[in-house]
Structure formats: C-alpha cells, structure tokens
C-alpha cells in the first residue's frame, strides 16, 4: 500500500509540552485506514420530486434530497446555493443590493460592512492568474524568524494605515475584514435568499479565494511578490499553541479582543466549545490528533457528506463539512472572547473578534487560521482514495467577487481555485502525524450489556440532550462478509437535530460505552465523532432562530476495531458539551449499491421540472464517478 504521508520515513514527534519523542510510522497498514484498499464504496441514489417535508411540492420547486454522493465529507452539503427552482451555479453577489449584515437574526452589525461597489457590475471581468515565475510558499507560523515576523507586521501595519487615509480603499484592513462580514452574516441575498458560505460546499473555495487576494495585497504593500501568508499549524503538536507573534501588544498583529485561554502557553483544544477540558496537556494533544484523524480520514473518505442532501438554496437543513465542523469552528471560539463577557469598550461580547463571523476578519490571526484550513484541503486530497474535488458543475461554476491588490474588481469561479500551484502558491512541507493516529480501544473489555440500557425507541425523539444518555440500537445486519462490507457502508445517522443558531453547539458520540464514559479522553476507538455549530445567520427573519441538521457517522471501521461485527445490537452514548439540543431520531442504515430514481420520466413536464431532469443526470453521473454498476 502506498504511504498516506507526505514523506516516506517515520515521523519523529515531540509532544508540545515535553521533550519526549514518539515515533509515528508514516506508512500505515490497511487496518489503519478507514477506506480499506480493497473496498469499493457504492451508494444508493434516490431522486425524488419532494419538498423538505417529503410532500409533493405544489409549486414545482424541487428539492435535491436523497441524492447520495459519498460517505463522509470534506465539503459539506450544498444547502446555501441560490438556485431558485432549477439547478444553477451560485452567481457573484449583487453589491448594489447589499443589506446591513446581522450579528444574529435581530441584531445588526454596528457598522456597514458591504464592499465598495464598482461603477458597473456587468462589466466586472473574470480574474486571470498572472504568470508565475516563483511560487509563494506559506510557512508555519511557529517557525518564523524575526525578519519574517517584522515583514509581516509591516504589511499589516500598512494595510491598517489605509483605514485612516483611504477608508473606502478595498485593500485596507477593515475593508478586507468586511468581506467575511458581508458574505457570512447575511449581507448578500440572491432572489430573496440569504447567501451564506458557511455550512455549505462553498466554504473551502470562498475562503481560498479570499486568502489568495489578501496574500497578494500584503505582498504588494511591502513590494514583495513572493510573500507567503503564514499558516497556524494547529494540526501538529509544535503548532498547538497560540502563535506568540500575535500576542505582542502594540504590534499590528495584536488584537485586544481575544479570550484569556490563549495566554500562558496553554495548548489549544481543537474540539473547544467554550469550556476548557479538565485534562493533562499531553491528553489534550492526543485528543487533537484523534480529532484530526476522525475528521480527515474516518469521516471524510469522499467529497460530500454521506446521504448528502444536494438541497436548494434556503433549505432548513444545515450541514457543514468535517473540517469546517472540527477543527475550524472550535479554533474560532478558542481565540475569541467568551460570549457574555465584557469587551474592552464596555459592551457585552458576542464572541468578538474570532468567535463571531462578522468580526473574525478584524483579528489578523483569522487569516493564518484559515491558511491552515486551506492547507487541510490539500492534505485531504493527498491522503488518497476517493478524496478528490467535486465534479458537480453547479459547484465548479459558482462565483464570488473580490478586489485584487491594485483595487480592481474581479469575478472568480470555484473551478479555478482547485490547484494552489496554478494559483501561484504552495505550503511549506510539514509532517502530518494525525494521518497515523488511529485510536485504539481503551474502554473496558467486552461488549456493553445492551439489555441494561433502553432501546432507541424509548429515548427518541429526545426533547433535550442535557446529560449523557445511552441507548441500544439494532443494526441492519451483523457478521457481514468482507465482500458485503466492500459493497455497503454502515452509517449511524441522527436526524432532526434542532438548536438555537445563535448558540455554540457541540455533542460527542461514543460506541460500546455507558454514560459514565470519560468524554475528555477522545483517543479511543469508541469515539465516533462530534456535532458542532458556530453562531451564525443563515436565514434572516427567522423569529425562532432554529437550525435543523443531520449528523452521519461511518461506523464500519469502528465496529471492526471494537470487535462488535457479530453483534445484532450495539450501545451508543451521547455526551452534551455545549448548547441546548433536541434530536428527532436515530437509525443505522447501509448505503446500497443501486440506483433508484422514483421519478417517472415519461410523466415529467421538463419545461417546468427542469431540476428533476438535472437530478437524474446527477444520479447517473454519480454512478459513473464511483464506478457503480446499474
């Protein structure tokens, strides 16, 4: 088997808080991978002309529900795509109709953060990459020398100077921060629907383009076209602390609106959601590496979420990709001020700066954080298997609007940002120990007595997840052969997860443990994954502020590791970490090798139901892409 790591030798790993060294093999065995080399994952694809509630849509506005595009997912659901009633890419926003963004559904951002408007949006050209003579290399923040830090400070300082001398200049610091505010807090609408680049498949490409121009602006301000934006290397033990260069008062990189937990050399918790984990720093490091393995290997073997809903823009279902879920959101929260605390200006905190989308860009660290998020996109694809970019044309042809380093407006497409080297930059080669950090069984030996805990039918629907709960659930099949596993993936699905979208949300899922599990230790095979959500505006005008989501976890590998393959019934434990959550139901399903289109094409009025026609095409495309046999 080919190595999944970027180097061929073993990685010598020092813990961030001790001088001890652990050797992590860079060439995992087949059992270390979620997608075993001989597996050929296949999925049932069902295309229905139904609305979100499963009823016939009287307006012929068709939902892309039940289109299965893969198990696990880096990108998330296409739930924020302004398509109206037919399939179409997301167009760039109309800057002339930008609304005042909101911190939440009722509170407006205290300043106007819409981008400067070009004279004529219809004449804004598509961006063309300049010729590349030398790649810009983005370095890890913890390894920068004093000269590089000084150059970085100078670039940010000059960017901030423009806020005073030319406040409407689109390359100024506040104007750059406003980009995230407008795109992420309800500033732009298309056909009456709020454009939201989070909790959707637009997350990675939007932020890549955002940082691309930001980096070029920094380089132009210091006359250095080779300047590379540093990345906060939080996925490696050496980078699991707050980068010191950002914590020097009086410098351009400093931001006073940050939480106290970043100081004193504290290690970052990549699963942080407002409460510090009571554990050792070494355990925190292993938790982080486990989370990275789960998010980039176990739960993201394919581009899109399992049983993915390619929904129309404006859906009430919100599903982020695995990396956006964790570690992206927890890092935002860990750096920002604690919600409800008092800010330096005397106002009550909404998580500013990093802990709220509208203000995140005001912290220079935001861009280094997202530089590493962007790097994860590359690292995920380098892991191999079916980890490739989406080929859906709606995604590839979706567009955004940005200003370049000269203040000129441009439109950009998703399809043009898939290769960083073609864009003119790359990342400094850095070890990725999480690739080999497959957790082992740590709970008590044997199977939990499922007869001593209630069945899922007596637990769900669950009105409030306010304490750890355990339940038993029947599997659709047990003692499956390897051939059956190759053809069908077992998926644990939590449906109708509801919560207030103004709150931080997290709960963890474990298999074969009871409700006394130590949920602060994640480096065990029994840990299946987590659901998280960062406060955001997804639907302006929703008085209930209620978000509805689904969590899907691939458990075939976990059942093998724990030794439960022959069991008809297994125990599942949920541990709430943050926020008020209700869950409608839970089930285990097998993803089946079969194409099922319940639409009768002979009765379609294609001029009215164009999307259903497109859906059938997508179904066939998926079959071809994943080597289905129909």
Curated annotation (Swiss-Prot):
Protein's GO biological process: pigment biosynthetic process
Reaction catalysis annotation: 2 catechol + O2 = 2 1,2-benzoquinone + 2 H2O
Details of cofactor binding: Binds 2 copper ions per subunit.
Transit peptide start-stop: 1-87
Broadest EC class assigned to this enzyme: oxidoreductase
Cofactor(s) the protein needs: Cu(2+)
Keyword Cell division: no
Keyword Metal-binding: yes
Binding site for Cu cation A: 180, 198, 207
Main function: Catalyzes the oxidation of mono- and o-diphenols to o-diquinones.
Family that this chain belongs to: Belongs to the tyrosinase family.
Protein name: Polyphenol oxidase A, chloroplastic
Species name: Solanum lycopersicum (Tomato)
């Amino acid at each position: 088997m080919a190595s999944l790591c970027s180097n061929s030798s073993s990685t010598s790993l020092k813990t961030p808080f001790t001088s001890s060294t652990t050797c992590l093999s860079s060439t995992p065995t087949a059992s270390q991978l979620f997608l075993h080399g001989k597996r050929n994952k296949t999925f049932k694809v069902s295309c229905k002309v139904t609305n979100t509630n499963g009823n016939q849509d009287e307006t012929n506005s068709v939902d892309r529900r039940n289109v299965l595009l893969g198990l696990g997912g880096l990108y998330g659901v296409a739930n924020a795509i302004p398509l109206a009633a037919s399939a179409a890419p997301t167009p760039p926003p109309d800057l002339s109709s930008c609304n005042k963004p909101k911190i939440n559904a009722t509170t407006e951002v205290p300043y106007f953060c819409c981008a400067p408007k070009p004279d004529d949006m219809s004449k804004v050209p598509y961006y063309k990459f300049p010729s590349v003579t030398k790649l810009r290399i983005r370095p890890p923040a913890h390894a920068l020398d004093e000269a590089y830090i000084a150059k970085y400070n100078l670039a940010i300082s000059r960017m901030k100077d423009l806020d005073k001398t030319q406040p409407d200049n689109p390359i100024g610091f506040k104007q750059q921060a406003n980009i995230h505010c407008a795109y992420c807090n309800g500033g732009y609408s298309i056909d009456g629907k709020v454009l939201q680049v989070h909790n959707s498949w637009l997350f990675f490409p939007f932020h890549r383009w955002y940082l691309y121009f930001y980096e070029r602006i920094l380089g132009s301000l210091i006359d250095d076209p080779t300047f590379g934006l540093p990345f906060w290397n939080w996925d490696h033990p050496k980078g699991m602390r707050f980068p010191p260069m950002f914590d020097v008062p009086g410098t351009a990189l400093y931001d006073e609106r940050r939480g106290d937990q970043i100081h004193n050399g504290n290690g970052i918790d990549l699963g942080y959601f407002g409460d510090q984990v009571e554990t050792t720093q070494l355990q925190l490091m292993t938790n982080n590496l486990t989370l990275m393995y789960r998010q980039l290997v176990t739960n993201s073997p394919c581009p899109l979420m399992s049983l993915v809903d390619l929904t129309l823009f404006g859906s009430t279902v919100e599903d982020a990709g695995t990396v956006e879920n964790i570690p992206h959101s927890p890092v935002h929260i860990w750096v920002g001020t604690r919600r409800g605390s008092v800010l330096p200006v005397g106002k009550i905190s909404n998580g500013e700066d990093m802990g709220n989308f509208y203000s995140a860009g005001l912290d220079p660290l935001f861009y280094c954080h997202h530089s590493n998020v962007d790097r994860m996109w590359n690292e995920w694809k380098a892991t191999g298997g079916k980890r490739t970019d989406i080929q859906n044309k709606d995604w590839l042809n979706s567009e955004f609007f940005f200003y370049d380093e000269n203040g000129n407006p441009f439109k950009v497409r998703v399809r043009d940002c898939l290769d960083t080297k073609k864009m003119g930059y790359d990342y400094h080669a850095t070890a990725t120990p999480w690739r080999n950090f497959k957790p082992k069984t740590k709970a008590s030996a044997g199977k939990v007595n499922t007869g001593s805990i209630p069945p899922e039918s007596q637990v769900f629907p669950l009105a409030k997840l306010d304490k750890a709960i355990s339940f038993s659930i029947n599997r659709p099949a047990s003692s499956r052969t390897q051939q059956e596993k190759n053809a069908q993936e077992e998926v644990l699905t939590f449906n109708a997860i509801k919560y207030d979208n103004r709150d931080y949300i997290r709960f963890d899922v474990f298999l074969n443990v009871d409700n006394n599990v130590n949920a602060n230790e994640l480096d065990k095979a029994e840990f299946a994954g987590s659901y998280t959500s960062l406060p955001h505006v997804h639907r302006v005008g929703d008085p209930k502020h209620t978000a509805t989501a689904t969590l899907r976890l691939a458990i075939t590998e976990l059942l093998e590791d724990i030794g439960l393959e022959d069991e008809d019934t297994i125990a599942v434990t949920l541990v709430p970490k943050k926020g008020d959550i209700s869950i409608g139901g839970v089930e285990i399903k097998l993803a089946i090798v079969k194409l099922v289109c319940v639409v009768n094409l002979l009765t379609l009025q294609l001029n009215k139901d164009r999307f259903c026609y497109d859906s059938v095409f997508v179904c066939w495309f998926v079959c071809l892409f994943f080597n289905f046999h129909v």
